[in-house]
Regions:
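Catalytic machinery of carbohydrate-active enzymes
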Residues: 1-328
Length: 328
């Protein structure tokens, strides 16, 4: 095995989950060069990863604003050049590790002259949007979807797996100076989520900060434009920070002792950084059994169709239960 190509062109958290498989592939075939085809956003999860030889940037045909050059002609040319470049590398194995079928990734893979191409089919995929899959197919962690395609690795559970990200040393130093350093544990509140059903109301975050703020440093992370207004912070002691890039986000998170987040990328980034996680999930087996943080101490809370039904007291108790294991 000389060269392996993985294609993962979806979300940041999904790419973080793929780092377990990448690491296992490198251990199985230590002399193989592992390449990854990623998109602009999720590629940051692979920066400085010693298991990865090179990351290639996917070129979109329709969502061209996501490309380095967004014009139609430029995008077509850049995609053609990308295909030709990858073909010249003569890969031995191609893997699309998604549990569901990613049509863009599969279409791209079909253009590659690679002798061994593996991805999930309509018969083997798991798409949590399809009721028949949830009702009739085994629910396993998304990480294992990739391992199912590579039985040579002999991995069938997440018990001995972990995720990997590598924060920039310079950015770690920057955030060490920026964040509170008073001997208390740093707890990250990740208050943003694009999905309505995974948004915990600000009033709950406020109440949680009120309960924990005397004993811990509360660091609030939010998406651009979603930082709480100063009036909303009256009565609580917190530090709101701006992480404008994914590398900044990873580096800032590396200074935390605990992550509190709904089901999204911070759950997996926390796990990759070996930081305990309190995860807030919808009460759907196909969510919390597929996307829990692996390789790290964690507490999962799930209730109702929307996480706003998870109580503040339950989250506080989960935080307290994990803190003694990380910070005494």
């Amino acid at each position: 095995m000389r060269r392996i190509l993985l294609i993962r062109i979806d979300f940041l958290g999904d790419m973080v989950c793929t780092t377990a498989l990448i690491h296992s592939l490198k251990r199985k075939w230590p002399t193989a060069d592992i390449h990854v085809l990623a998109n602009k956003y999720n590629s940051y999860a692979l920066e400085d990863n010693p298991d990865v030889k090179e990351v290639h940037r996917y070129v979109y045909s329709k969502s061209r604003e996501r490309n380095n050059r967004s014009g139609l002609i430029s995008s077509l040319i850049d995609k053609f050049l990308l295909i030709m470049h990858l073909k010249r590398l003569n890969f031995d194995l191609l893997i699309i590790p998604n549990g569901g079928m990613n049509k863009n990734a599969i279409q791209f893979a079909r253009w590659m002259d690679i002798p061994d191409k593996r991805w999930h089919t309509a018969e083997t995929e798991f798409d949590d949007r399809k009721i028949e899959h949830v009702a009739n197919r085994p629910i396993k962690h998304e990480v294992l979807a990739g391992y199912d395609l590579v039985p040579e690795l002999g991995v069938t559970s997440t018990d001995d797996l972990r995720l990997y990200v590598y924060p920039s040393l310079g950015l770690k130093n920057k955030w060490s100076e920026t964040l509170e350093n008073n001997g208390k544990a740093n707890i990250g509140f990740f208050i943003s989520n694009k999905a309505h059903e995974r948004r915990w109301p600000w009033g709950n975050w406020y109440s949680l900060a009120k309960l924990l703020g005397d004993d811990f440093n509360i660091i609030i992370f939010s998406n651009p434009g979603e930082k709480p207004e100063q009036d909303a912070l009256n009565g609580i002691t917190v530090q709101c920070i701006d992480t404008e890039t994914v590398p900044d986000l990873i580096a800032a998170m590396s200074r935390l002792d605990l992550v509190v987040s709904a089901d999204s990328a911070p759950v997996h980034l926390g796990a990759a950084l070996q930081i305990p996680v309190v995860g807030l999930f919808e009460a759907r087996l196909e969510k919390y059994l597929r996307w829990y943080p692996i390789g790290v101490n964690h507490v999962l809370l799930h209730s109702g169709k929307c996480i706003d039904s998870i109580s503040v007291v339950d989250v506080k108790d989960a935080v307290i239960s994990l803190i003694p294991q990380t910070y005494d």
